[in-house]
Design a protein with these regions (language model features):
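Terminal substrate-recognition subdomain of acyl/acetyltransferases
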Residues: 1-107
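A conserved beta-strand-loop-helix scaffold within acyl/acetyltransferase catalytic domains
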Residues: 57-68, 74-180
Length: 180
């Protein structure tokens, strides 16, 4: 569904929070322009917003809205036609010997926050003073516009949490919010 089709009817206009700009996390030296909506107003059409390229952060939904760039792409994996490659099967078979997974409600813990901080410091070179505290972790990953439909996909090995995915369960899709 195209953004123009979703925006008709006034609901999205009521949810409109504005545009923001930041350094593009995907293309060095570029600026990203984002369109923000209040997720509380659009929860019941969130699946359609995903189809239009929106993502979620806490209680807000957003999408890249750059005027001169269209490089950000939504990745969809149609599960009914997806077939693992030989390499994917090999990695899967090795992984199930080492890791266990659990799906649980999204909740805060110091262990999860520390795992996210480790990821951000390593993967994004985020300085210590910018790393999330409990409040920012909760706002971004736990307190959402989707309530109990936001879940955690936990990855464990030897009794230690080593990976965490925050996912939104929708009627026809799972949407990954963040994985670290």
């Amino acid at each position: 569904m195209k953004l123009q089709e979703i925006m008709t009817g006034g609901l999205v206009e009521m949810a409109y929070l504005g545009h923001g700009r930041c350094a593009c996390p995907y293309l060095p030296g570029r600026e990203m322009r984002l369109l923000y909506l209040d997720g509380i107003w659009v929860e019941h059409i969130y699946d359609k917003l995903l189809d239009a390229g929106f993502r979620r952060s806490g209680t807000h939904v957003y999408r890249p809205d750059c005027l001169s760039c269209n490089e950000c792409k939504v990745i969809r994996v149609p599960i009914d036609t997806f077939r693992k490659t030989k390499e994917q099967r090999r990695v899967w078979n090795q992984g199930i010997k080492v890791f266990t997974t659990r799906v649980a409600p999204a909740e805060y813990s110091n262990e999860k926050r520390d795992l996210q901080r480790l990821y951000l410091a390593h993967q994004h070179d985020q300085p210590e003073y910018e790393l999330p505290d409990e409040d920012s972790y909760r706002r971004f990953l736990v307190d959402t516009c989707l309530g109990e439909r936001t879940r955690e996909l936990q990855l464990w090995t030897n009794g230690q949490l080593v990976g965490l995915g925050i996912i939104d369960e929708l009627p026809n899709a799972l949407s990954t919010v963040n994985f670290f």
